[in-house]
């Protein structure tokens, strides 16, 4: 059935009028379709990646090479989801990008005016980065299925959407980093845990 806005009341979870290509820090969560466990196991409060989880990790690190305006910060691959912090920076040389501070002026604050009047675009918006990451990981996973390395998936590898949070302060950044680092320890209490 084709999309019909009168029937399919799909509500956007993005900030209205926010320009997701602006430089700043973004906390992102991407879940597997159906929350199926695909990327490894949590053993004694530590995430043990299987070959599919290692592939996800590899493609996350590859994002920086593909997008000049991107830094990949803290992340964790979990059995059925992936958390990370992307930093969109001004387009610069790799050496200049390494010198960009993590917080302070680069923290992204929600605009009070429509995005079109703000300027300051750094490059591709967040959704383009996520789409590329999902495409690369899905294609690699499909190759693994064809080679008998990964189990097949039904419909798609990832959920259609993703969750994002614009990081607006040092305190928020610190809390999110701690959340990411402690995620394996909290696995059995996680709402995404489905044995």
Positions of predicted regions on the chain:
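Short catalytic/metal-binding and nucleic-acid-binding patches
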Residues: 1-195
């Amino acid at each position: 059935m084709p999309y019909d806005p009168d029937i399919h009341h799909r509500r956007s979870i993005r900030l209205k009028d926010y320009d997701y290509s602006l430089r700043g820090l973004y906390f992102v969560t991407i879940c597997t379709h159906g929350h199926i466990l695909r990327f490894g196991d949590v053993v004694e409060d530590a995430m043990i990646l299987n070959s599919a989880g290692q592939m996800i990790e590899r493609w996350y690190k590859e994002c920086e090479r593909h997008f000049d305006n991107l830094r990949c910060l803290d992340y964790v691959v979990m059995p059925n989801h992936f958390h990370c912090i992307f930093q969109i920076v001004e387009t610069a040389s790799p050496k200049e990008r390494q010198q960009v501070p993590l917080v302070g002026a680069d923290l992204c604050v929600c605009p009070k005016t429509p995005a079109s009047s703000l300027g300051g675009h750094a490059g591709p918006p967040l959704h383009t980065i996520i789409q590329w990451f999902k495409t690369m990981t899905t294609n690699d996973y499909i190759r693994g299925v064809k080679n008998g390395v990964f189990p097949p998936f039904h419909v798609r590898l990832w959920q259609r959407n993703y969750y994002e949070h614009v990081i607006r302060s040092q305190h928020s950044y610190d809390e999110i980093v701690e959340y990411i680092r402690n995620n394996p320890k909290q696995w059995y209490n996680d709402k995404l845990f489905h044995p």
